[in-house]
Amino acid sequence: MSVKWEKQEGNVGKLTFEIEQEKVKEGLDRAFVKVRKTLNVPGFRKGKVPRQIFNQRFGEEALFQDALDILLPEVYSAAIDEAGIDPVDTPQVNIESMEKGETWVLTAEVTVKPEVKLGDYKGLEVEKRETELTTEELEAELKQLQERQAELVVKEDAPAENGDTVILDFEGFKDGVAFEGGQAENHSLELGSGQFIPGFEEKLVGLKAGDEADIELTFPEEYHAEDLAGQPVVFKVKLHEIKTKEVPALDDELAKDIDEEVETLDELKEKISKRLQEAKEESVAQAKQEEVIAKAVENAEVDIPHAMVHHEADHLMNHFAQDLQAQGLTPELYYQFTGQTEEAMHAQMEKDAEKRVKMNLVLEAIAEAENIEPTEEAIDEEISTLAEKYGMEKDAVRAALGDMSELKSDLKIRKAIDVLLDSAVEK
């Protein structure tokens, strides 16, 4: 096969490749078998017309496009292998020459994986973070657990304060007319939670059960409902009841309520301390990893093709849809609730996608610079881990992974991250 690669501006180039006559003939034969099944030719049963009769009636050229469709995936794959390029998008293939009895000549405008110019990635300075759990952190966790056990009790003849929960009716009016979605009865609202638009909860502070009030507010300019954004409104409210939190004492009894496996507060503290210590060490390690990767990426130069960003954004959108589905929602319902559009969400995803693409490209370049190749032992160990995680046999995991290219790529990137971490300097 004759192949020619001409690099053009940026990450785009022109790939010229040929399909020799022997291969063309194979494609035409396969195309005829496919097409013949659908043909009705007088004098022959359906699907039984001979090749010679077909050529006489329709001409061999009638098979060219079907033959090309059959051959193109194989010959294009061989062409990019021979050219030594790594496409990142599906190309537009053009026919330069497709004559009967001659070699077919094709061209494709191909966007390829960009080259990465690495900067400094070893010996990078990172922040030294404290890994030891502090008394304050333990006390804060205990206080949260204590407050979760709090009970709401009715507040008699006392004004509402931040942190209280009020039961109220409300109805919103714009220009004296009630607007859609602005009404509720016996609604439970924790003051200070920020569930309502700015100012609403603050103006309930100081009211008592049985009080009625008109609350004048202006909707935020960025509010999702266009007819209300930036508009002045009045909410008529009536408070039915005010409840306040009654927090139990932090003692052995509360400890047993929080965790049935402990008998005393000291046992609970010890158990929580261990969990928090492990979580803090993991969090510090993660923060260090993110910082050192970010610095290596910042030091590198790479011109990222938009196609890579777009594909990654599509990938993120699919994950987003799956997360919504797990919550019993659909993207359509989410957009309806938030007032956002799919296009706006995709544009937002592209910002994250560009960062992810650059990070992966830089880590792959580091792996290449360090001559990192996963060993068979490392591959087998990872397969064992996956088999245990998903409850599968190792052979089934191997079959699902196919040529192992994705697994090998993941392992190489992990090793590249280890290179960054092992050489990082904490200051």
Curated annotation (Swiss-Prot):
Catalysed reaction, written as an equation: [protein]-peptidylproline (omega=180) = [protein]-peptidylproline (omega=0)
Coiled-coil zones: none
Cellular localisation: Cytoplasm
Intrachain S-S bonds: none
UniProt-listed PROSITE patterns: FKBP_PPIASE
InterPro entries: PPIase_dom_sf (IPR046357), PPIase_FKBP_dom (IPR001179), Trig_fac (IPR005215), Trigger_fac_C (IPR008880), Trigger_fac_C_sf (IPR037041), Trigger_fac_ribosome-bd_bac (IPR008881), Trigger_fac_ribosome-bd_sf (IPR036611), Trigger_fact/SurA_dom_sf (IPR027304)
Keywords in alphabetical order: Cell cycle, Cell division, Chaperone, Cytoplasm, Isomerase, Rotamase
Residues covered by the PPIase FKBP-type domain: 163-248
Keyword DNA damage: no
One BP annotation, GO: cell division
Enzyme Commission number(s) from the entry: 5.2.1.8
EC class (word): isomerase
GO cellular component, one term: cytoplasm
Gene Ontology molecular-function annotations: peptidyl-prolyl cis-trans isomerase activity; protein folding chaperone; ribosome binding
SUPFAM superfamilies: FKBP-like (SSF54534), Triger factor/SurA peptide-binding domain-like (SSF109998), Trigger factor ribosome-binding domain (SSF102735)
Protein family per UniProt: Belongs to the FKBP-type PPIase family. Tig subfamily.
Domain notes: Consists of 3 domains; the N-terminus binds the ribosome, the middle domain has PPIase activity, while the C-terminus has intrinsic chaperone activity on its own.
Function field: Involved in protein export. Acts as a chaperone by maintaining the newly synthesized protein in an open conformation. Functions as a peptidyl-prolyl cis-trans isomerase.
Name of the featured protein: Trigger factor
Source species of the chain: Listeria monocytogenes serovar 1/2a (strain ATCC BAA-679 / EGD-e)
